[in-house]
Amino acid sequence: MSSYPRNYPFYNWVPKWLGILILVLMFIPILTVGGVYSVNSTEMMSGLGIISEHVTFTNFATSIGMAAFCPFLYRLVVIRREKMMCLAGFSMMYGLSYICAETDSIFLLALCSVLMGFLRMVLMMVNLFTLILYAGRIEAYLKIKPGLEPVDGEGWDKLDIERSIAQPGIYLFFMILGQLGTSLTAWLAYEYEWQYVYYYMMGMLLVCILVIFVTMPYHRFQNKRFPINFRQFGNATLFCIPLVCFTYVMVYGKVLDWWDDPTIRMAAITAVLTGALFFYMESTHRSPYYQVGVLKLRTIRMGVLFYFLLMFLNSSAMFVNVFAGIGMKLDNWQNASLGNWTMLGYFIGGMITIFLSMKKV
C-alpha cells in the first residue's frame, strides 16, 4: 500500500467521512439493480402480458450468476483498483439494465440476469474490501489469503472470534441495505410505472459513475500478471448452464406439462450432460473451479444449511412475498412496507450475535 495515495482510493482532498459515506451509498445500487424486481412483478406481468414463472425464472438466474462469482473472490479483491472495477461494473450494469427495461424476450432477460448477478457480487466484494481498508485500515483480503493461516490452536481460536464478530456485522449491513433497496423499488413501482424502476436505477448508476470519476484517481495495476484468465470464465459458464437448465425445468415444468413439452426435455438433457461434464472437469483438473472437497467438512455443510434456512426464512424472500400477496391480499408496496419491520429484527439479532461472540460463547 506504500505506492498508493494516503487517502486511497480517493483523492487527498476528499474528507474521510465523505469517502466512507460514498462507499456505503454505492452499495444501494449494487444490492438493488437486477434483471427483474420482484416488488414490481405484478405490474410487469400485466404490462408485458407474461406469466409469473418468467419473473421467478429470471430471479433464480440472478442467484445463479451470484453463485458463479465465488471462486473469483480472492483473485478480484487483490487487484486493488476500485476506480477501474467500479467504472467497468457500473457501466456494464447500466447497459444490461437498459436491455432489461426494453426487451420482451425472456431468454435475453434471463441472460442479463445471470450477468448482472455476477457483476453484483464483483462490485459488492470489491467495494466491501475497499470500505474495510478505508474505514478501518485493515487489509481484509489477508484473512483469506492462502498460506497465511494460523499455525497453532490459539491462532485459530483468535481467527474464529474475529470472524464470528465481523460476519454478523457484514450480514446485518447488507440485509438492511437490501431491504431499503426493496422498499425503494416497491415505492417507485407503486407511484409510477414498472419501467421507471429500471430507469431510476440506471440514473443511480450514472450518478455513481460521475462520483467515481470526480473523487477517485487512476491507479496502475501493481502486478505484471493479471490474476484472471478467460478459461476461468469458461468454467463459470459451464457451471451456470446446468443450473439454469435445471431451474427452467423446475419452474416451467407444471406450466408446460413436464415431459410433454420439447423444451423441458431439451433442458433436462442439457442439464444432465453439462452437469456431468462440469463434475468430470472438476475431478480431473489440477486447479478446479470449485473446491467440491470442502463439502466433506462438517462445518461447511452446517454453514450451507444455516445460510439456506436464513434465506428461506427471510421475510423478503419469494415464498413469504407470495404468501402475503395471495393469503393476505397485500400489494407489493404494502408487502415491502411490512418487510421494513424486519430491519429491527436484523439489528437486534445482529447485536445479540456480536455480543455473544465477544463473550466467546
Region spans (language model):
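Cytosolic juxtamembrane N-terminal segment immediately preceding the first transmembrane helix
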Residues: M1-V33, V39-T42, S46
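Extracellular/periplasmic helix-loop-helix junction of adjacent transmembrane segments
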Residues: S38-F69
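Glycine/proline-centered helix-kink
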Residues: S38, F174-W187, L243, M318, ...
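Hydrophobic transmembrane-helix bundles of small-molecule transporters
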Residues: Y190-L305
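12-transmembrane solute porter fold
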Residues: W17-I30, S38-V39, P71, Y289-V361
